[in-house]
Amino acid sequence: MNTKEKIKVGILGATGSVGQKFIALLANHPWFEISELAASEKSSGKKYKDTVNWIIPNELPKEIGVMKIKNCTPNLNCKLVFSGLDSSVAGEIEKDFAQNGYTVISNSKNHRMDENVPLLIPEVNPEHLELIKHQKFNGGAIVTNPNCSTIGLTIALKPLLDNFGIESVNVVTMQAISGGGIEVMKSDVVKNNVIPFISGEEGKMETEPLKILGEFNSNKISFANFSISAQCNRVFVFDGHTECVQIKLKKKNTTKEIINIWENFKSIPQIKDLPSAPKQVIHYYEDENLPQPKYQCDIDKGMAVSIGRLRTDNLFDFKFVVLSHNTIRGAAGGAILCAELMHINSLL
């Protein structure tokens, strides 16, 4: 595609941490160009650079900085919007956009478990996009990105479920402060600390993977049939969610077999060479000290999942460690990959 053919996109919640990450990742995208920025009424009418508390290491693009912010109402000059809105307001705003003919790709939790809304990880459940045909939004649609901690876990589980079957999973997370948004990042409470509770997080991790890994049958999803128990902690790391996983499988196998399956896992985004897709979805590390957020978080531009420390377990069958970038793979980058998948399927 040349520049003139790029698809215009808008960003809802453009001044927040996820909205900023959308801007950084879309700045030089080969298929999409930012045409609209929308945020709260207090920011409306102001230049973006004059109202945003820019926290992204990348420099704010000049052409974005001078754009005027609009209200989050469905009169934007685009037909695709990425939503980084807070869940306190996202539900009705996203629905309003969809009912007015916009395609909404949302990072918010509000519509994730709706019956006809895809909860999408492009490498895991691309067929779930068929649910869009059963939405009643007058030409619009809603597609959701899973919770940031759900994505790394579910990518690790997908090849295991397909090859061996899963009986049960236990996961303990160590989640970066960037996952809590700007207010958490600015808070003194998280400094040199571990907070053993993240509101609503454990419920998401125990249910979202079951929908994502579920089987699509003509017009609905039959959830995957295994149990997940989760404990979620906020730790003093800026980026990168680390998860310690225990798993019981239905078929016997070896660590060598599992590692081989992980390292060779690929799906439509890799086959079609989508712009945001990692070349290798899962990287396995033999070094028992890895993966670590400091060193593996940005592998493949933050879109790959890193796994290490696979070994047998006394209570389950195996245990291992998963790492993924929470604001790229787990938020804005994952949502952009969803849009790319939709584009090649003529759904935009």
Regions picked out by a protein language model, each given a short descriptive name:
Residues 1-197, 220-221, 226-227, 305, ...:
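N-terminal Rossmann-like NAD(P) cofactor-binding subdomain of oxidoreductases
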